[in-house]
C-alpha cells in the first residue's frame, strides 16, 4: 500500500489531521505529505487545508474493504482491490494476454482509475472513493459469437442491483447503459479475447455512479445521476458491491445455460426508449426508426418510419430523435 492510500485511510474519519502528525505516522516529510494531498485532490478527493488545523476530507469516506464485501456475499470469487489503477479492464486483459492462469470469476476492484474508459474509447470519470469500478474475468467454451448478447444480460444484473437500493426503477438503453429518470447511472464494457468457435476469455467491466464529486461532474458531457442522489440513505459501497457480485453471478450462469431466452423480455420491460423514435448511429450509416426492443440474440429491433419494415441491428449508438413526432 502506497503512502497516498495510507493518507486517505487517515483522513477517512472526516476529522482534521496535521501534516506533521501524518508525516510522523508514515515516516515522510511534511512536504511529501503536501505533495500527496495535491495528487489526491487532483483525482477527485475534496481535501481542505486550514492553517493550524491541518487537512480534512470533507464528509469523510467509507473505503472499500474486501473482508466487508465477503461478509455480505456468499460467493467465493477471487477478489483484488487496488487503491489506484489505470484501468481495471486493461489490467485483466493484460493478464489474459500473458496467460496468467486466471480463474473464472476473478474480480478486480479499484478506488480510482486514472484511465477509466467506456465503449468506443470514451473516458469514464473515475474519482477516488466515489463510485464502483469493477472488472470480472469469465470464460466461455462456445466462442466469441456466443458472447455477443452478454452486455445485455450484465445490464440487467446492474439494474437489478440498483433497484434494491432505490424506489426509482432503472431503465436500460441499448446496448449497455443503465439509466434512472433518463440520466445515466451506469455503463458496461465487455471485452473479449479468443476464438470464434472455441474457448474465449471475457472481461466484464462495470462502472456505477455512487457519489459524484462536483469536481468530476464538470467533465461529463451527458445527463447523469448517482445512487446517493436517488436513494433515501447513503450507500455503503461494500454492501452494494456484494449484492452486485451476486447478481452478476446469477445472470452470468443463466446466460451460460440459456443465453437471453429467459432475459430478453425483462430487458424489454425496462427499455428506456420503448416505442419511441430513435436515431441509430453506426460507423457506416445513420438510421431512424421506432425502437421495438431486442430479440433473443440481443439485436435491436428498429421499425422504419415509412415502410414499417423491422430490421435487426447488432451495433451502434442509440439516441432519441426528439425533433420527429411519434406516429
Region spans (language model):
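Conserved active-site carboxylates
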Residues: 177
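Short, solvent-exposed coil/turn segments
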Residues: 50, 75, 127, 173, ...
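Long, positively charged amphipathic alpha-helical accessory segments at protein N-termini or as interdomain linkers
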Residues: 1-29, 35-38, 42, 143-146, ...
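Short loop/edge segments at beta-strand edges and connector loops
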Residues: 83, 172-174
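N-terminal lobe of the biotin/lipoate ligase/transferase fold
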Residues: 2-155, 163
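Short connector loops at helix/strand junctions that flank enzyme active sites
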Residues: 103, 127-131, 173, 183, ...
Amino acid at each position: 500500500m502506497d503512502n497516498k492510500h495510507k493518507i486517505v485511510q487517515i483522513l477517512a474519519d472526516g476529522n482534521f489531521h496535521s501534516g506533521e502528525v501524518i508525516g510522523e505516522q508514515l515516516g515522510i516529510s511534511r512536504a511529501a505529505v503536501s505533495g500527496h494531498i495535491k495528487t489526491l485532490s487532483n483525482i477527485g478527493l475534496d481535501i481542505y487545508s486550514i492553517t493550524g488545523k491541518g487537512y480534512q476530507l470533507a464528509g469523510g469516506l467509507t473505503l472499500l474493504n474486501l473482508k466487508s464485501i465477503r461478509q455480505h456475499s456468499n460467493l467465493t470469487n477471487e477478489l483484488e482491490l487496488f487503491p489506484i489503477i489505470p484501468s481495471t479492464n486493461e489490467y485483466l486483459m493484460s493478464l489474459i494476454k500473458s496467460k496468467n492462469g486466471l480463474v473464472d470469476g476473478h474480480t478486480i476492484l479499484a478506488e480510482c482509475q486514472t484511465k477509466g474508459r467506456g465503449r468506443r474509447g470514451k473516458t469514464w470519470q473515475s474519482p477516488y472513493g466515489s463510485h464502483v469500478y469493477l472488472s470480472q474475468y469469465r470464460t466461455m467454451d462456445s466462442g466469441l459469437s456466443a458472447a455477443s448478447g452478454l452486455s445485455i444480460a450484465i445490464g440487467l444484473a446492474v439494474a437489478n442491483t440498483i433497484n434494491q437500493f432505490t424506489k426509482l426503477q432503472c431503465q436500460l438503453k441499448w446496448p449497455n447503459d443503465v439509466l434512472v429518470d433518463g440520466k445515466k447511472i451506469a455503463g458496461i464494457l465487455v471485452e473479449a479475447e479468443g476464438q470464434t468457435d472455441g474457448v474465449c476469455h471475457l472481461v466484464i467491466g462495470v462502472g456505477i455512479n455512487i457519489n459524484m464529486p462536483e469536481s468530476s461532474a464538470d467533465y461529463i458531457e451527458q445527463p447523469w445521476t448517482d445512487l446517493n442522489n436517488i436513494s433515501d440513505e447513503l450507500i455503503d459501497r461494500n454492501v452494494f458491491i456484494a449484492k452486485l457480485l451476486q447478481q452478476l453471478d446469477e445472470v452470468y450462469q443463466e446466460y451460460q445455460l440459456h443465453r437471453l431466452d429467459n432475459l430478453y423480455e425483462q430487458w424489454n420491460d425496462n427499455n428506456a426508449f420503448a416505442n419511441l423514435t430513435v436515431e441509430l448511429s453506426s460507423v457506416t450509416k445513420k438510421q431512424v426508426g421506432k425502437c421495438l426492443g431486442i430479440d433473443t440474440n440481443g439485436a435491436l429491433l428498429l421499425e422504419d418510419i415509412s415502410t414499417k419494415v423491422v430490421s435487426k441491428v447488432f451495433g451502434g449508438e442509440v439516441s432519441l430523435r426528439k425533433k420527429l413526432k411519434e406516429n
